[in-house]
Amino acid sequence: NINDIKDFGHNYRLVSESKKALFTIFHQKNLIFPPHLRFSLQCKDLLYNYIPITTILDPMISNDHYEIIETLATFMLDADFEVKRAAEIMYVHRNTILYRIKKANILLDQDISSWPFCHELYSAIAVWRLKNNI
């Protein structure tokens, strides 16, 4: 089918353009889908166009709470918002993950599960991870 070939070619180009960003942001993912590719390209654009999306992380950065940012990155990007999976990836107890999420809510003065803040935070965390690993 010609459409399958076009889709394959399009997805191959997406992977080629976003491979480094993709595996930096989603380094624990075993399965990658086209939305992951598109999101990685968006984050790459945000990073290289100096769009200040990571400023929402400033309350955690200014207080040296990098373990909370790493926990949020693992929880949101790697574990798909699953506390148990995040705890397994980080080799900590699930209550540690819950404590750090609660601490993030306090530091950010927002509920990280509320929409649209959750989407903004997800993007900021991804760009932060990309920025700190390139």
Q: Predicted regions span which residues?
A:
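Cytosolic nucleotide-utilizing catalytic cores of signal-transduction proteins
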Residues: N1-I134
